[in-house]
Design a protein with these regions (language model features):
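Glycine- and acidic
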Residues: 1-2, 12, 52-57, 89-106, ...
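A short core secondary-structure module
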Residues: 1-50
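A glycine-rich, basic-preceded beta-loop-alpha segment at the flavin cofactor/substrate interface
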Residues: 3, 41-56, 61, 68-99, ...
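Alpha-helix capping/hinge segments and adjacent helical runs
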Residues: 64, 183-263
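Mobile "lid/hinge" segments at catalytic clefts and subdomain interfaces of large enzymes
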Residues: 99, 106-110, 114-122, 247-248
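Helix-rich, typically C-terminal accessory recognition domains appended to large enzymatic cores
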Residues: 150-168, 194-211, 238, 246-247, ...
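C-terminal helix-coil-helix/basic helical segment that borders enzyme active sites and/or dimer interfaces
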Residues: 157-193, 294-308, 333
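C-terminal amphipathic alpha-helical interaction region
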Residues: 253, 271-329, 333, 339, ...
Length: 349
């Protein structure tokens, strides 16, 4: 139980700490993982003397104030090495990948909350004259408010579809052990983290805008979404670092995984051509642009040359991939409902 750095809810607190042994080399290659308890545990399992750990201060944060972030001081503390020596970062990244998926979901969750909060406000806030309800409606009748709400809803659906696709890839990788699924799960992980958190930040900002002046007043609660979600682009690996990981390590297969996803999108576009030809042509051109971008990045053998455009590439890839996933999910639901004889119910919904 390590929440909040220190507490008296349990007999002991166990900290996982990255540190370097005295005889290990400098840099990240020399980092090992240590278990550092608040109290030294005796041989018989009972709690012994206090270890050299103390809480230096509690940070005053912009948001997520329900979680205390502490400065911990380690003074001649005793730690126990976990796992192989100098493999601490490898062990940490196992945890980090899971955390990145969770943080992406956190961004989506805050976005959904901000959207619902804003929708309720727009349905009840009377301001100005309505052009569609005998001049006595609420701000949801205003075109720009509707635009923002529709944008929020679409972006949430898109980011959620990416996270679900990543979850599917992880499940399939665990079930089959096939390299294709393993690589896809790894490829989508930084995308899930970045896209979900960036969407959360953008949507919570739109939520403040929909509230107008009241959004700047703490009473409405709209500002809290912005404060709380802002850190998601920072912790568990900043979004910029995630984007660099995508165009770097995640493309060490010469773009094979990226091309596989692009080919899946092309299949969807080809199937769409018989229904919406004009739209399929535009999507086809965009998909080829995405393919050309991957080819350009792969051509830069010096990975650092890819980093300048890493973030725009990740967001563009996520937006386009989510378009095909969410459209596929929608069409699949349409087919399912009609096959179940529920066409009337579908149309009503």
């Amino acid at each position: 139980f390590i929440t909040s750095g220190d507490h008296d809810l349990t007999e002991n607190i166990i900290h996982l700490v990255l540190a370097r042994a005295d005889d290990s080399p400098a840099g990240t290659k020399g980092i090992s993982l240590f278990l550092v308890p608040k109290f030294i545990v005796k041989d018989d399992g009972s709690v012994g003397p206090r270890n050299g750990i103390s809480t230096g201060s509690i940070e005053t944060k912009m948001g997520i104030k329900g979680s205390a972030t502490c400065v911990l001081n380690f003074d001649d503390a005793t730690g126990y090495m976990i796992g192989a020596k100098e493999k601490g970062l490898s062990a940490m990244f196992t945890m980090m990948n899971n955390a990145r998926l969770g943080v992406g979901g956190q961004g989506i969750g805050v976005a959904e909350a901000a959207f619902q909060h804003s929708t309720e406000y727009a349905l009840n806030r009377k301001q100005g004259k309505s052009t569609i309800q005998n001049k006595h409606g609420t701000i949801i009748d205003h075109a720009d408010v509707r635009r923002m709400l529709i944008s929020m809803r679409a972006d949430i659906f898109a980011s959620r579809s990416i996270e679900l696709e990543n979850a599917k890839a992880i499940d399939m990788a665990n079930a089959t052990g096939e390299p294709e699924w393993i690589n896809k799960a790894a490829f989508l992980t930084p995308i899930t983290k970045v896209f979900g958190t960036e969407i959360g930040i953008n949507i919570s900002n739109l939520g403040v805008q929909i509230h107008g002046g009241m959004g700047f007043i703490e009473e409405t609660g709209a500002a809290q979404f912005s404060r709380d979600v802002r850190v998601t682009a920072i912790y568990e690996g900043t979004n910029g670092i995630q984007a660099m990981d995508l165009v770097g390590r995640k493309m060490m297969d010469n773009g094979e995984t990226a091309y596989a996803i692009i080919n899946q999108i092309k299949e969807y576009i080809d199937n769409l051509s018989g229904v919406k030809k004009d739209l399929s042509v535009l999507l086809g051109l965009a998909n080829e642009t995405l393919r050309e971008t991957v080819e350009y990045l792969i051509s830069k053998k010096e990975v650092s040359e890819r980093f300048g455009g890493a973030m725009p590439f990740l967001m563009g890839f996520a937006n386009f991939d989510s378009l095909h996933i969410s459209s596929f999910l929608f069409l699949s639901n349409v087919i399912f409902f009609f096959e179940m004889g529920q066409s009337t119910l579908l149309l009503c919904n």
